[in-house]
């Protein structure tokens, strides 16, 4: 993660109302909302579409094992793992990420 990304995220977090907005999206207890957003395995297995799963190998927010599990469940999934990348593949590898998504959507 670059200093620019750190600075950008910090600046966003100290904007007036930022903390309140986050808390409103995920009120305590936060894990309850994570579970509420989860889909049952049967629904995931039933996905009929080509599915692109993208993950940063060094992601400390969501373990890579989650994406590996998704790909095991989704019949038509493909996984792309970016090395030297944390949670924000779309920022940390913006150009490569955009090309990958564009190519996936235009196939």
Please place each PLM-identified region on the residue numbering.
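Short beta-strand/loop motif that positions the catalytic acidic residue
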Residues: 47, 53-55, 59
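Conserved alpha/beta-hydrolase catalytic His-Asp/Glu region
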Residues: 1-45
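Active-site helix-initiating loop/hinge in glycosyltransferases
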Residues: 56, 63-66, 92-93
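Short, conserved loop/helix-junction motifs that constitute active-site signature segments
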Residues: 44-48, 73-74
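Structural signature of beta-strand start/N-cap positions in the alpha/beta core
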Residues: 50-52, 75-78
């Amino acid at each position: 993660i670059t200093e620019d990304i750190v600075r950008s995220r910090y600046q966003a977090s100290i904007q007036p109302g930022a903390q309140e907005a986050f808390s409103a999206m995920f009120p305590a207890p936060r894990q309850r909302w994570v579970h509420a957003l989860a889909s049952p395995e049967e629904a995931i297995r039933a996905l009929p579409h080509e599915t692109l799963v993208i993950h940063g190998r060094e992601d400390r927010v969501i373990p890579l094992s989650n994406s590996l599990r998704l790909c095991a469940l989704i019949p038509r999934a493909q996984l792309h793992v970016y090395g030297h990348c944390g949670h924000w593949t779309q920022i940390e590898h913006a150009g490569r990420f955009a090309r990958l998504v564009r190519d996936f959507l235009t196939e």
